[in-house]
Every structure is written in C-alpha cells, then in structure tokens.
C-alpha cells in the first residue's frame, strides 16, 4: 500500500529524473545546434562556387561574344560614351587577343581589345575578361 510519504517520494524522484533528463536534452540540443551551425558556416565559406571555364578553354570567339554582350549592356548606363559615339549600339571592330604562350593554364584574364564606332566618333576599349569569375573590366584610350 502506498503511503503519502511514498507517493510524494515517487513524484519527487520522477520530477528530479525528468528535470535532469530535460537538462541533459538541453545540453544535447545545444551541442547539436552548435555543430550544425559550424557545418553550415563551413559550407557557406568553403564550398567551391560554380566557376566558369578556365581562359585556356575559352575560344577567342567565345571571349568576344561575352565581352560584346557585357559591353552592350553597360553602354546603356554609360552616358558619356553614348554621347561621344552618338549611339547606344556602336559597330564593334575586334583586335587580336593576345594569349600567354608559356603559362597557358595559369592565365586568369584575357585582354580583349576592340574599337567601338558610332556616327559621332570612335573609341578604343580594352576588355579584361576574367574567365572563371565571368565578368569584364574595361579601360579605354
């Protein structure tokens, strides 16, 4: 027969076990969350991005097409160049793309020179095509 003392003792022990089990689960949960956070951060910072082709894998025609598309998109925002050339869609004349003869696989950037001509003028540009990153920087005369 269960006495009042036995009943209280059983409830107290149950609650103590429950509380310590809860504390144990909190510790496990915190460790689990911490480990997941570390894994997520590592994935974000160290996961290799999808990169474009290396420059030695890009043909001259592909480089010119990429630079031309990028240039024509940017021309819409380059008011000074539009005024100088007299058009947003100039005629483009390509120069020779110089490639490295010694360290072909280490080449990170292709220099793509071209001339843009419009009804009001012409301008020489040098597109620096960063192949793997997939963007172009420009310089002009």
UniProtKB/Swiss-Prot annotation:
The keyword NADP does not apply. This protein is able to protect a cell, which harbors the plasmid ColBM-Cl139 encoding colicin M, against colicin M. Residues 51-141 form the YebF/Cmi domain. Disulfide bonds join 55-131. It holds the Pfam family YebF. Keywords: Bacteriocin immunity, Disulfide bond, Plasmid. This is Colicin-M immunity protein. The keyword Disulfide bond applies. It comes from the Bacteria. It comes from Escherichia coli. One of its GO terms (biological process) is bacteriocin immunity.
């Amino acid at each position: 027969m269960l006495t009042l003392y036995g009943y209280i003792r059983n409830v107290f022990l149950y609650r103590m076990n429950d509380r310590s089990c809860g504390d144990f689960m909190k510790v496990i949960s915190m460790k689990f969350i911490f480990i997941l956070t570390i894994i997520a951060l590592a994935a974000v910072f160290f996961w290799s991005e999808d990169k474009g082709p290396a420059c030695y894998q890009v043909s001259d025609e592909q480089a010119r097409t990429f630079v031309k598309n990028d240039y024509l998109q940017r021309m819409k925002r380059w008011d000074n160049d539009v005024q100088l050339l007299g058009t947003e869609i100039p005629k483009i004349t390509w120069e020779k793309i110089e490639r490295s003869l010694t360290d072909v696989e280490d080449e990170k950037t292709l220099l793509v020179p071209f001339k843009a001509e419009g009804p009001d003028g012409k301008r020489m540009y040098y597109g620096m095509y960063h192949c793997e990153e997939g963007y172009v920087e420009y310089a002009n005369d």
